């Protein structure tokens, strides 16, 4: 009977555990299916296997060690019972009761330790696959890789063991206390005796050994000290704290020896005296000695003493942020611009950005969203060769936002089967404006109509920034494709994305994982059905590579007629010796509070590289992780861990590389650090004599920090135009411009940073000074005031500083928007040069007013791109053939082929309609 009861209890416990773990197990199963579908199964299994290995290992070690200490303590006190529950009905069972309590608590502690250990899989793998850096720290002469890849594991193991031994000590003390082995009546020397004293002494020895190891590692932590003149080890750290940590490590080891030797003594006098002496020496070495050194030796001679350590900080901070290769040039800022100079730089002038992304986004939404469930989330900036001209453009994908579907139409079928994708994009050149103040659109409408030599062959967007719901494709019901007059167009997904849901077992798993019974009972599923999840591209790439940090502003590129998302991925660390974390840098909070930088640089990040670009297909969801920095040791470590994840730099297609751009947020981070770290002289740095800052500008009516901006221009001493990202600098507490920085994005020059410094003795107007001159111009201020009084909202766009050869000019677009409207129109363009400030209807007129030169826009052949042109009879024959193929696929229940044929049929109908209208 007892055996039967035990079996029932055991089965019940197993079922309870299985039920509690079932959701986790099912989720792991669906995750495995997803990783297999996206061809990254090896990454999933590598991570999972190491997590399981560490979890099991930690649980077993913790449980065995803690239970062993409990067992030893109980055996050494087997002559006594636990002094609890006396005088109660449970008194006869108190030993069993306490044993169960200890078993449960030890199990819970072991589970907690295992759960806390399993996330360390990345730390272990980086340790095992570490790639050395090319340099060493200046204090211990250790490779930088030691601090980034090895020391974190050593310190983690030390903390892990300390917690383990300390927990064993506490459990043992509790057992002895409950057994009444600590008697207050004894002399303190005899508080512990015999085998109990031996047990406690050995555990104390283990604790003190680990404390000694901790002091040994603290020596290295001095390289990350933030309490001195600069980040990293200073004079006091090297000459006082370093000695103190050495001394305390030795003292802790001696204390461990004392604890072990006390085993042969019948009292605890030695360990007690040892602990007292240790505490006294700790205060002497760790507190008083460094304080004395700092106050009486360093402070009176701080610059002299700290100078070499300031130099270390400058050198290593520059290395960590990639600022050691900034090429510095002089920029004379001459006032020699004339019409001939502008003609010689037509590539720059014709690509001056007149459209600020903020009012342009409002314009896109008003003119091109078409339906309430479509949304333009952001405006991206890129460049294309259009009809032979290198053009900078702005573009945005039209995404599906299901939450904007009318509430009554928000059904399970519509959410997961019908409204599955966005459609198409809008593109305009940065510098062209129609007579009504609206942008000239190169690509527009639904289906996409192109006026240039760029075609959108696959406009459907299944994966994007707003695709936050899971969907099903390959169902027996059609998906909504796009709206058109009279009726909507429908389609069937024919791409490679999605996880097959072609069995009852898979439907059951996803129904349980997603808590959706409809997956089980819906009659729309077929043998070709697939589920698409992790469709948000930022979430999608993070699922594959959580060890990278991703830029929060993906952008689209039209490559071979397909919409591709490009995301910048960063490798970061907070363990680069002497490198100052971003959050500590001069006025860093100003940029950390703007945009996405705080997310990228969260924590104490003091090393960053943009080593990877990720491309995600908007239709299929396929991901490519391209290596763009082969010299990054952090990335090369991950490449050893996950060799199948990354695509080599040499294998990046040319048409993909043509759309890589220097990341805006990384540029901000580097520019922020350069505000202080352009100073290479330790004395200048100590005195903070030459601090810079980001300039300010006016947007609408508000002052704000100036944002870096992309520009196609010919850099000084360069032969041709290229796509660059630039930002001016001004001195702290002054408004004049002192320098400007450029980051190159094209070809072999990608990633190069250039700094152009103005002559110290020359006044070069900064952006805020130009804004003030605009405000002080009577004609301009009068016109702006007049518009405001007539009920229009005046929007002053970004002020752009445009370097041309060795001169500068300033451009600011002016937009008008009705107070109750959301459609901004570009009405004026302000150009400032030297002492002149002019505002006219167009950039061309403003330049002509100042320089006597008209800017001619590059000729663009306006041709609406549609499917291949055919004569009417050929089209009709093609339509009949496509219709026959559609019907044949429908009769065979081949819904994938049906979707392809029907889409082709509808495209041919549209082409026939346009050709008949044009005739």
Swiss-Prot record:
Membrane topology category: Multi-pass membrane protein
Instruction: List the record's Gene Ontology CC terms alphabetically.
Output: extracellular region; plasma membrane
The record ties this protein, via Pfam families, to:
UPF0182
Q: Which residues form each disulfide bond in the chain?
A: none
Key words of the record = Cell membrane, Membrane, Transmembrane, Transmembrane helix
Give the transmembrane region(s).
Answer: 6-26, 52-72, 96-116, 160-180, 198-218, 243-263, 268-288
**Compartments where found:** Cell membrane
Q: Which domain of life is it from?
A: Bacteria
HAMAP family this protein is in? UPF0182
Protein family according to the UniProt entry: Belongs to the UPF0182 family.
Official protein name in the record? UPF0182 protein Tery_4385
